[in-house]
Amino acid sequence: MKAVIADGQNGVEVISDAPKPTPEKGEFLGRVIRVAFNPIDWKTLYNASIEKGTVGGTDFVAVVEDVGEGVDRSKYIGATVSGWAPGPLDGSNAAWREYITLDVNLVYFVPKNITPSQAATLPLTFTTASQGLNQYLGLPLPPTDGSKNSAQQKWVLVWSGSSSVGQYVVQLAHHAGYKVIATCSPHNFDWIKKLGADFTVDYHDPNVVEIIKKATDDSVFYGFDAASFPETSTLAVKAFSSKVKDGKLINILSSPPSPRSEVKIIGIIDYSLFNREFNFFGNKIEPIQASYDHAVEVYKKLTGWLQEGVIIPNRVKEFDGGLQAIPKALREFASGKHSAVKFVVRID
């Protein structure tokens, strides 16, 4: 079986003798037809400390060919599903290979109204967005009966609204009934507003904090920093309302000190939803049952949200060529010379 692995020289290579996995109890075996890139893919594989031979890849779309014990064959065999695997943090269960196995509860069925490439843009970053906004901040998920959540006067600030995570945070916050203000580059303003932002701000503007406060009438009470750099989190916290008593800003991976005591920065790690422990370059990531339960609930509802147009996938930059195309495409992705698009490689 072909797979893409770390080459031990801060790069990746394609091999043809990787072992084909076998589904265990509660799992499926799928033939991978699409993979999408996330920053963790290149940041872990382009790293001298990663073990040579580690298989890469997180987001995938696959056609189910077999299932393990306890899985309804009539429901899954032949179905097209999408999810994300632990990837480089667990090289034995990663997406950049011809076949993949995973817990059937951690994938969603791809609806007919979106393409496999669009489907590949969702799993990891949508999970991250929902984990932060819905699980940790407690904002309601979009209804599944066509109704709408009650409108709120409070604002949610999304820093880096045009990132893959940010685009899904904007949509989830909008459907939660909150007003949304997002930072991004001006050329992405229209797209981010289409996704649900009420106001967009150029994050390059030296007066970005003051602009946010004025646009929201000093009413930002929740925030999500999808960039999660120390400087972006600091600016985001400063933009919170002067009236806030218990503000919360979601940060991906870490919980840096907050410049305001009344605003807490909450670090989230989406790998906690897997039922095992990970070592993230010396930092232990332990499983959290609530994160698994939340992911299962979200994946059950995601197919319907996509069918109804409640959730819009990221825009796609697609690469042909199968697994052999990944090394070159990954280098382009790592260069950072792209905006508001998800890199997807066709494997079939």
Curated annotation (Swiss-Prot):
Domain of life: Eukaryota
Molecular function as annotated in GO: oxidoreductase activity, acting on NAD(P)H; zinc ion binding
UniProt KW keywords: Mitochondrion, Oxidoreductase
Compartment(s) of residence: Mitochondrion
Gene Ontology CC annotation, any one: mitochondrion
Residue intervals passing through the bilayer: none
Keyword Mitochondrion applies: yes
EC number, UniProt record: 1.-.-.-
InterPro entries assigned: ADH-like_C (IPR013149), GroES-like_sf (IPR011032), NAD(P)-bd_dom_sf (IPR036291), PKS_ER (IPR020843), Trans-enoyl_RdTase-like (IPR047122)
Entry similarity comment: Belongs to the zinc-containing alcohol dehydrogenase family. Quinone oxidoreductase subfamily.
Record protein name field: Zinc-type alcohol dehydrogenase-like protein C2E1P3.01
Organism for this UniProt entry: Schizosaccharomyces pombe (strain 972 / ATCC 24843) (Fission yeast)
